[in-house]
Amino acid sequence: MKLKNLIILLSCAVLIASCKGKGLFGKDKKHDKSDVTGWNYNDKNMGGYQVSKEKEQATGPGLVFVPGGTFTMGQTDEDVMGDFNNIPRRQTVPSFYIDKTEVANVHYREYLYWLARVFDPANDPSYQKIQDAALPDTLVWRSELAYNEPLVEYYLRHPSFNNYPVVGVSWKQAYDFCLWRSDRVNEGNLIDKGLAAKQGLQAQQGEDNFTTKSYLLGFYAPQPGKQGKKSTLKTAQGTPRTQVTMEDGILQPDYRLPTEAEWEYAALGYISQNPRPSQKEGKRGEELIMNKQIYPWSHNPNGMRDTRHGSWQGMMLANFKRGNGDYAGVAGGLNDDAIYTSDVKSFYPNGFGLYNMAGNVSEWVADVYRPLTLLDADDVAPYRGNKYQKMLIVDSTSADPTTRFARDSMGRVKYTDVTDKESMMRRNYQRGNVINFIDGDSLSQSNYGYGNTTLVSDKSRVYKGGSWADYAYWLSPGTRRYMEEDQSSATVGFRCAMSRMGSTEGNKRKTGNWWKDKRQKR
């Protein structure tokens, strides 16, 4: 009996020792080590430097992964408009994510509902301006010689149009939607991990709401949720914590509008023209594109109809205007079966699984418009529109982020423009605002602001792809048009994108080429 009790006591002692970070028989728990110092990671006895397990970027809601690569950007069809604004040029686009579909009415109304709940004018009349600024312009449906009042009244709100693309949204409104979506997705990630409670959502009012940056800086502290028993978040002292940092891999990068190069690359979907694309680690694909495409779809990429045998043979592959007065065809045999817009998941997806990259509605992209951007821009990740900013410091003597920085009326951390004086000694850029770099500034041959004799300005934004009201010519991804960033149209919507962090070919894949290590012979 005494021997039995002794065995039980010894077992308890071993368990207690293991709970204190020791292994069996009191040996130190194994830790990952630094390759440069040899010190343990995640060891409170060696400084407590925390390094999370290597995590791959999760695919955000609604997104599709697009592996990067090289392609010829620009005109793929005859330039019948004579714009000479999309000269073909070889470009490389880094991997990224993009929405499978255009943002629909139901998605945008979710955004409007959140604004109405958090920025309730009953609490502060000034909040009405925030709601008004986000409302789409439904009057874009009006035309002097057409009866479109039903669309003005019902298109945004009626449930029959829930999954139809939102229109009447300016570039600025689309940009703000991306900011809001980023914060809601990251807030949802915290709730899913038990690091924030759902109960705290209803208490958010005014500037006291979750934004990713304000959370990281400590301006906003959510009500903690119920974490699992195996929480991996620890402080330097080894105790559990609920405050997440970017290094933990839980928060995702921002949603944003795709660049023009990203959008065009994604629209072409050339992976479907690769005869043997790489499917898994260690299996190298062909570096080959069999056919150059005019349109996004892989079936009959130079025509408008499906050529495959079956009930779908002859069906239109996009929602567009076939000719004067022909938006849908003849009753009983409609060709694209959509007079105006259609469901965001209608028509055949392209090689990346993306819907309506041609037709339905044109889409805003991030770039500022210039006719010759393709000649001026970098040949990797090209983009015109950089205006560098930094967080606004209101108290430079404070080490506390909540007093060193400030928030605006919507709870977002305030930013200020980087000045030319701050940039002049840098090697990679010398100005804070480089929107008109080499095309409209004093160093270039073109000056788009001089004398106000042009419609092109630093507020002109590119939109891509054809719409329900366009002829087939505009459905080619290489075509490009522009509007001012505060304007909108019944034919222009948008979709969001997100930058890819880590491996170029996606999760469970390594970056670069790898060879097996060989043992040296003695």
Regions found by a protein language model. Give the residues of each.
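Positively charged n-region of N-terminal signal peptides that target proteins for export
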Residues: 1-5
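Bacterial N-terminal signal peptides
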Residues: 9-14
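Functional-site microenvironments in short loops/helix caps that host divalent-cation chemistry
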Residues: 23, 28-43, 66, 72, ...
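A short glycine-rich, aromatic-capped structural motif
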Residues: 55-151, 162-185, 359, 493, ...
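C-terminal motif of bacterial Sec signal peptides marking the signal peptidase cleavage site
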Residues: 16-18
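Short, P/G- and charge-enriched loop/turn segments at secondary-structure junctions
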Residues: 51-53, 83-86, 480-485
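Basic K/R-rich, polyanion-interacting modules in nucleoproteins and related proteins
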Residues: 43-54
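Short, structured beta-strand segments at or near domain termini in extracellular proteins/domains
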Residues: 489-507, 520-521
